């Protein structure tokens, strides 16, 4: 009896000791778990705030700490996960359940219930027996007492293993006391331990939290149990075994290889913590109730295996920033702590799948690590989905980047609570104008009306495609439009237009927590395997909202990625998946992708749209800028709004009003005034000053190609009439007169052509400055170009009109040769001659005469010898005669300019007949003696005020002398023999040529032929085309045939024509025909002749 009482007392005291130690270990685990959370929070805070000071060393060290904490098992809470079917029961299961309360509402340790649980577990559960020593048959027959002894032995081994890493004398002493029952000494030792360990749960928790946490070693390591395949006792190893506890290792960025745990039969695969599903837990109904209540009230709300089972395949940034929802809240949020904690643990209840043991996260969005109260701002980031791939690539290559941390978490900017916005917040880091004014809705997109209309209708009507391609130049809004389109597809609002920006989907995307929108780019920076993991992990997951994948800058995508993407597209065709490819050109995409996608082209933005956007941004940012400066920025951006915004931001940093010279200086341009001065010198053939001015401009570090491009732009503006010459016009020579005359416009067009040809040489040359100088010196045209009018330049085939002089006025050969010499001398100083001619025109006092000379006249040569002589050329005889009338006024103007007597020679341009190459010189020596009306009547023109004339076409009749000469020639033809026909033909040709010349010079009223009408109407003297000559020749042939056949219709066998008809045919001939023999005609008389000679007539 005494022995039984002693044994019962010993067992009770040992059970009390064991329960107290188990309670302390459990409380120590919770306290250490909280300390790890605090440390993780500090690491994340340092990561997001300290990288500005030392972005290399601090980021790398903190990144390593985050990796270690994420992989560490000390962060997992054993109190939040129920025991699995095949997993050994945790020591937390031995704690008191619901209802074990004492006075004051605090928990206490019930030794009897704990001993019952220990005995029940030791007697029933086959998993609890994981001691390292074999159990003898005598021990098995010893009944409950021996079972309790074994339990005590196991608990003490576990306790000793948790307190230290080495197996020493303490473990052996405790083992001896428990196994051999050494009487009163052991009882006294156990009673002292029980008195020291019996404390409440809150007191122990306070002691653990207050105590020093540096030397605390986590004992919450998940046991790894390996079951032997043979019979007898199982050799087990694990954290609760104590004898074979593995040593701790320091993590250096490497992953811990998980050991395989085998089943008792050896046929099952590895047992992971993720297999603790709810259906398996439901088998332990009694244990689940108490455990759930304790989890809801006292735990932090995170299962100890949460970091492994929640959203597999995610990076440590995802796990640290989203999965851990417990943190430190502010003081005002403490009242709602229990409610928020209970709601958070309810949301994080994991749903299981019947066919899989792995957990799948719910569709609800996870919260950030530190959840503040509703008064604080939300998290904002710039990237939604590419960071998952970026972080995986970061871990793989052991790299560091601020993009991963800043893009996922952002940096907080503290505000006053009165200006709090729950969804948006501003970072301390400066935001560029491009980021700050990024379009958020379709309405904000600029200059892409067709694309916006098409995509908006597709969202409203839910007519979605699988593949979209947005292509176009850079800075036109392709990526922004893709993001807006993705947000609109996932928007939950029932109103249009979408996206609304207020629904849960839009808010989650703005906060960076939307998993339905994944953005990847640029693709060339990431691994092919990571992209495939992203596609395989998200495409096949069913979701109510469409999943959108944005591949930005897919120009660098490899062929393997295209092949894999095409396969994924084929598999994802019936699902709610949308792929948006953003590139600059369609040439980089394979034909398989292009044939399946909807293509949207984003053209360059107009300068007016860019100016409007920049003006709006400048008003928002309070930037003082001129309107012309905005136009210059827009013109230099080449249709890219992003480039224009970056230029405006760069100019705003100068801190002064932005003007056009400031923009030109910043972007490396030359002012328009300097460019016009350079062009004026080059076109005026001022070689020395042109070279000096060019070197002065090149000293400002301007590229020769850029300078040539600016010169071409200025010339184009001048030709278009959009350039203003009001500044410094009096100092220039070529651009002195406004508007520019036609000849000067021709010079500018020729200069533009010269610059365009020189640009090709400039691109391939090493000495660009020399080629640019040569091109500018070639802008001054030569003499042939100066003497050639714009009207004659179109013909191309004719020679310059100044080479054909009037032979009647220059009868002497010496005079014409002297004029040629003077003309050659004048070509050397042609710019000076032109300036003198312009000064002469300005000296004229008659306005109509000044206008007339400017349009119709031009100076050919100027001889400033002993007898100064001026040669003037006019386009037509009428203009020449008008100039002769005002000879005195012109002479006075020349004498006023040259300050010496001058002789003026007025000439008319020669005209060339295209048919017979006969030069007609319209020179009338008697014009000087006639008055203007008489002169007009003589040449047969009605002159108008504006200088244009109207010609009257008449037929030339023959004089009496010509008529007698013609009759004599006909008589000779009748009487001459047959052998002299050649001489007769020659005489007739000479006669016809003289008649044709007389016809063109003498003009009287009469009848007209069809050929002459065509010639006069079309300006036969100026024609050189084949079709017009052909039409004239055909008309002449028809006229000749009609005239020859006219008398033959009167009587039969009449081969003679009247003299009048013969004369008409002779005048109209151009090519003479071979004369027919008249031998037969002499023998046979004509019926017409007989009828005329009959006396009856």
Swiss-Prot record:
Q: Which residues bind Zn(2+)?
A: 491, 500, 503, 506
Q: Where along the chain is ATP bound? A: 472-479
Q: What is this protein called?
A: Protein STICHEL-like 3
Q: Name one GO biological process term.
A: DNA replication
Keyword terms of this UniProt record: ATP-binding, Coiled coil, Metal-binding, Nucleotide-binding, Zinc
Q: Name one GO cellular component term.
A: DNA polymerase III complex
Keyword check for Coiled coil = yes
Feature: compositional bias, Polar residues: 10-20, 126-136, 993-1003
Biased-composition ranges, Basic and acidic residues, are: 95-113, 137-168, 281-291, 332-345, 796-807, 818-828
**Natural source organism:** Arabidopsis thaliana (Mouse-ear cress)
What residue spans carry the Low complexity bias annotation?
346-358
Question: What's the superkingdom here?
Answer: Eukaryota
Coiled coil residues, start to end = 742-770
What molecular function terms (GO) are annotated for this protein? ATP binding; ATP hydrolysis activity; DNA binding; DNA-directed DNA polymerase activity; metal ion binding
Q: Where is the composition biased (Gly residues)?
A: 227-241
Family, according to the entry, reads as follows: Belongs to the DnaX/STICHEL family.
Specify where the region named Disordered lies, as residue ranges: 1-22, 74-168, 220-293, 321-358, 400-436, 790-828, 913-932, 956-1003
Bias regions of kind Basic residues — which residues?
Answer: 245-259, 411-429
Q: Which Pfam families match?
A: DNA_pol3_delta2, DnaA_N-like_STI, DNAX_ATPase_lid
Listed InterPro entries: AAA+_ATPase (IPR003593), DNA_pol3_clamp-load_cplx_C (IPR008921), DNA_pol_III_sug/sutau_N (IPR012763), DNA_Rep/Repair_Clamp_Loader (IPR050238), DnaA_N-like_STI (IPR054506), HLD_clamp_pol_III_gamma_tau (IPR045085), P-loop_NTPase (IPR027417)
């Amino acid at each position: 009896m005494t022995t039984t009482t002693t044994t019962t007392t010993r067992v009770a005291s040992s059970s009390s000791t064991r329960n107290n130690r188990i309670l302390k270990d459990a409380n120590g685990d919770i306290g250490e778990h909280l300390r790890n959370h605090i440390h993780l929070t500090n690491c994340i805070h340092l990561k997001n705030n300290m990288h500005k000071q030392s972005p290399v060393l601090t980021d790398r060290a903190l990144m390593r700490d985050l990796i270690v904490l994420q992989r560490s098992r000390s962060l997992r809470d054993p109190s939040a996960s129920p025991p699995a079917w095949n997993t050994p029961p945790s020591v937390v299961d031995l704690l008191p359940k619901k209802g074990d309360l004492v006075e004051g509402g605090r928990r206490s340790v019930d030794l009897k219930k704990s001993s019952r649980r220990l005995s029940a577990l030791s007697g029933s559960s086959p998993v609890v027996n994981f001691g390292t020593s074999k159990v003898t048959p005598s021990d098995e027959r010893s009944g409950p007492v021996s079972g309790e002894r074994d339990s005590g032995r196991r608990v003490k081994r576990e306790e000793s293993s948790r307190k230290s890493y080495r197996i020493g004398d303490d473990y052996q002493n405790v083992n001896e006391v428990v196994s051999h029952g050494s009487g009163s000494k052991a009882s006294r030792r156990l009673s002292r331990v029980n008195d020291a360990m019996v404390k409440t749960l809150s007191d122990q928790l306070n002691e653990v939290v207050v105590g020093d946490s540096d030397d605390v070693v986590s004992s919450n390591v998940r046991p790894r149990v390996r079951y032997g395949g043979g019979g007898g006792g199982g050799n087990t190893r694990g954290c609760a075994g104590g004898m074979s506890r593995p040593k701790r290792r320091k993590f250096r960025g490497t992953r811990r290889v998980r050991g395989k745990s085998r089943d008792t039969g050896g046929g099952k695969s590895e047992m992971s913590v993720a297999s603790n599903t709810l259906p398996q837990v439901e088998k332990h109904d009694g244990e689940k109730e108490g455990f759930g209540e304790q989890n809801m009230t006292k735990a932090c709300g995170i299962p100890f295996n949460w970091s492994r089972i929640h959203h597999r395949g995610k990076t440590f940034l995802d796990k640290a920033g989203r999965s851990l929802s417990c943190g430190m809240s502010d003081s005002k949020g403490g009242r709602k702590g229990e409610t928020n904690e209970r709601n958070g643990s309810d949301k994080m209840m994991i749903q299981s799948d019947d066919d899989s043991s792995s957990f799948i996260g719910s569709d609800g969005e996870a919260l950030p690590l530190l959840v503040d109260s509703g008064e604080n701002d939300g998290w904002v980031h710039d990237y939604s989905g590419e960071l998952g791939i970026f972080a995986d690539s970061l871990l793989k290559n052991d790299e560091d980047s601020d993009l991963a941390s800043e893009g996922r978490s952002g940096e907080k900017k503290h505000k006053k609570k009165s200006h709090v916005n729950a969804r948006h917040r501003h970072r301390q880091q400066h935001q560029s104008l491009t980021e700050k004014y990024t379009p958020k809705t379709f309405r904000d997109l600029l200059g892409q009306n067709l694309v916006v209309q098409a995509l908006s209708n597709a969202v409203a009507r839910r007519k979605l495609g699988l593949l979209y391609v947005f292509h176009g130049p850079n800075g036109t809004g392709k990526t922004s439009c893709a993001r807006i389109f993705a947000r609109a597809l996932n928007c939950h609002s029932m109103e249009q237009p979408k996206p609304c920006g207020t629904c849960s989907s839009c808010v989650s995307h703005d906060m960076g927590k939307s998993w339905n929108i994944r953005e990847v780019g640029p693709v060339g920076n990431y691994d092919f395997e990571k992209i495939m993991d992203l596609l395989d992990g998200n495409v096949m997951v069913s979701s109510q909202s469409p999943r959108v994948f944005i591949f930005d800058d897919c120009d660098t995508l490899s062929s393997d990625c295209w092949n894999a993407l095409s396969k994924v597209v084929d598999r994802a065709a019936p699902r709610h998946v949308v792929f948006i490819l953003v590139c600059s050109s369609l040439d980089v995409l394979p034909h398989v992708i292009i044939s399946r996608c909807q293509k949207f082209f984003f053209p360059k933005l107009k300068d007016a749209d860019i100016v409007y956007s920049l003006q709006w941004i400048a008003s928002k940012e309070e930037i003082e800028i001129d309107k012309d400066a905005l136009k210059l920025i827009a013109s230099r951006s080449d249709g890219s709004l992003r480039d224009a915004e970056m230029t405006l931001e760069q100019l705003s940093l100068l801190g002064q009003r932005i003007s056009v010279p400031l923009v030109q200086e910043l972007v490396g341009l030359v002012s328009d005034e300097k460019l016009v001065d350079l062009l004026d010198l080059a076109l005026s053939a001022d070689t020395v000053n042109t070279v000096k001015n060019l070197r002065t401009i090149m000293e400002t570090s301007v590229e020769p190609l850029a300078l040539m491009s600016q010169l071409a732009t200025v010339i184009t503006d001048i030709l278009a009439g959009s350039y203003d010459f009001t500044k410094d016009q009096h100092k220039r020579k070529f651009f002195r007169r406004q508007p520019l005359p036609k000849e000067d416009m021709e010079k500018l067009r020729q200069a533009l052509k010269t610059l365009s040809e020189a640009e090709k040489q400039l691109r391939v040359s090493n000495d660009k400055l020399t080629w640019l100088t040569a091109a500018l010196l070639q802008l001054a045209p030569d003499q042939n170009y100066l003497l050639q009018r714009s009207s004659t330049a179109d013909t191309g085939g004719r020679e310059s009109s100044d080479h054909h002089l009037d032979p009647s006025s220059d009868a002497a050969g010496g005079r014409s040769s002297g004029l040629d010499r003077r003309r050659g001398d004048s070509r050397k100083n042609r710019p000076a001659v032109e300036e003198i001619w312009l000064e002469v025109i300005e000296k004229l006092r008659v306005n109509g005469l000044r206008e007339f000379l400017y349009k119709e006249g031009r100076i050919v040569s100027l001889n400033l010898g002993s007898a100064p002589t001026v040669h003037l050329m006019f386009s037509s005889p009428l203009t020449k005669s008008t100039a002769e009338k005002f000879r005195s006024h012109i002479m006075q103007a020349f004498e006023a300019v040259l300050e010496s007597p001058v002789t003026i020679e007025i000439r008319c341009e020669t005209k060339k007949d295209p048919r017979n190459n006969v030069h007609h010189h319209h020179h009338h020596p008697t014009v000087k003696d006639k008055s203007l009306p008489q002169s007009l009547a003589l040449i047969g023109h009605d002159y108008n005020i504006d200088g244009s004339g109207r010609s009257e076409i008449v037929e030339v009749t023959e004089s009496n002398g010509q008529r007698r000469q013609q009759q004599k020639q006909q008589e000779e033809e009748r009487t001459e023999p047959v052998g002299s026909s050649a001489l007769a033909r020659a005489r007739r040709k000479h006669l016809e040529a003289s008649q044709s010349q007389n016809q063109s010079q003498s003009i009287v009223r009469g009848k007209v032929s069809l050929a002459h009408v065509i010639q006069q109407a079309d300006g036969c003297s100026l024609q050189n085309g084949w079709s017009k000559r052909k039409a004239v020749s055909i008309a002449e042939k028809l006229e000749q045939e009609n005239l020859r056949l006219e008398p033959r219709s009167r009587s039969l066998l009449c081969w003679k024509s009247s003299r009048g008809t013969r004369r008409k045919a002779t005048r109209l001939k151009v090519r003479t025909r071979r004369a027919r023999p008249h031998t037969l005609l002499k023998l046979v008389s004509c019926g017409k002749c007989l009828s005329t000679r009959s006396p009856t007539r």
